[in-house]
UniProtKB/Swiss-Prot annotation:
GO terms for biological process: protein ufmylation. GO terms for molecular function: ATP binding; metal ion binding; UFM1 activating enzyme activity. This is Ubiquitin-like modifier-activating enzyme 5. Keywords: ATP-binding, Metal-binding, Nucleotide-binding, Ubl conjugation pathway, Zinc. It comes from the Eukaryota. GO terms for cellular component: cytosol. It comes from Drosophila pseudoobscura pseudoobscura.
Amino acid sequence: MTNAIDELQAIIAELKTEVEEQRAVIRQSRDRIEHMSAEVVDSNPYSRLMALQRMNIVKNYERIRDKTVAIVGVGGVGSVTADMLTRCGIGKLILFDYDKVELANMNRLFFTPDQAGLSKVEAAARTLTFINPDVRIETHNYNITTIDNFDNFLSTITGDGTVAGEPVDLVLSCVDNFEARMAINAACNEKCLNWFESGVSENAVSGHIQFLRPGDTACFACAPPLVVAENIDEKTLKREGVCAASLPTTMGITAGFLVQNALKYLLNFGEVSDYLGYNALNDFFPKMTLKPNPQCDDRNCLLRQKEFQARPKPVVVQEEAPTDEPLHASNDWGIELVAEDAPSDAPTDLSQSTDVGQGLRLAYEAPEKSSAEATQAATAPVDDTSLEDLMAQMKSM
C-alpha cells in the first residue's frame, strides 16, 4: 500500500513538473520586426501608428523604440497600461508587482482565468510578448516598499534604461495603496525622475492621473491624503470580507488617459496634462496644476524646488501676428468683394449700369420693357358696374 501511494505521489509530481514547463513556454506570434514601416499591408502591425507621421501629429514615431517605461503595479490600471504601450511598440517595459492573478481579478481587463495562480508580472510578460515580440519585457516580483527591495527598485529605474546604465524615460504608478505611492515618490524625488501617478476611487466611479516633475510641480508628499498625513496604517482601514468596487470601464478610461499623456510626453506632441480627473457620474473632467509645497516633508523635494528655481527661465519668443495682406496686390479690373448682408449701391436697372473697367464692353444692352409687360404693368380702371349689369350686357351681345 505504501509503495502504491509513493508511486502515485511520484506521478503527481511529474505531472506538476510537466504543467509548469508548459506554462513556462512563452508563445511567439511572429518574428521580430527590425524597423517600423509605414507600408499599408495586412501583415504590418505598425502601419496605423506610423500614419501619425503622415498626418503631422508626430515627427518621428519610431523614436518610441528607444524609450523605456517602468510600470509599478500590474493590476486593473497597470495591466491595461502595459497592454496599450506594448501595442504602441514601446522599446522596453519594466514591470513591478508582487501579487498573483486570482479569479477575483477577472472583472478587470487583460488577465484570463487560465492565468490564475501565476504572478501578475509573469502572466503579463507572457501575454505582452505574444502580442508584440518586439518589446523587451523585464519583470520584478517583489514589494518595493521594503528597505531591501526599495534599493533594488531605485537601482533598476536609474540604471536599466534602454541604454545600459541610463535611467528609464518615465515611471508610471498604477498601485492601489499610498505606501507604494510614497515609495515611488521618494525614489523619483531622489533621482529627479519624472513620473505619472494614477488611481481609481474605491467606489469605482472616478479616477485621475497626475504628472509629477520634481521641483516644478507638487510631489505626492506636498499635499498628502489624510491617510498619509495622519500616519494611519492602511491595513487597519480594510475590514475583512469588504473590498473596494471595481469597474473595468473606469480603469480602462484611466489607463487610456495615462498612456495618452505618456505618449505625448515621450514623443513630444500635444499638451501633457499636469492633473486630469474623471467623474463617471456626470462625465466631469477637471484639469489643474499643483504647485510644490515650500514646507514639504520630503527633503529631496525641497532640494529639487531650489534647483528648479535656480534654473534659467526659458525665454518665450512672441511671434508677430501675421498681417492680412491682399493675395493679389494689383487689381487692374477694380474687382471688389461685397458681404452678403452689405447694402447694395448698384442700380437695379442693368440698362443704366454701363460703367465698366477699361478694356471691357457690354456683350449686349438690356432690352426695354415690351408692350406686353407695359400692358400688364398698367393699372386697370376702376368701374362701379355691378355683376348683374355685366351679365346683362354679355347676354345682349
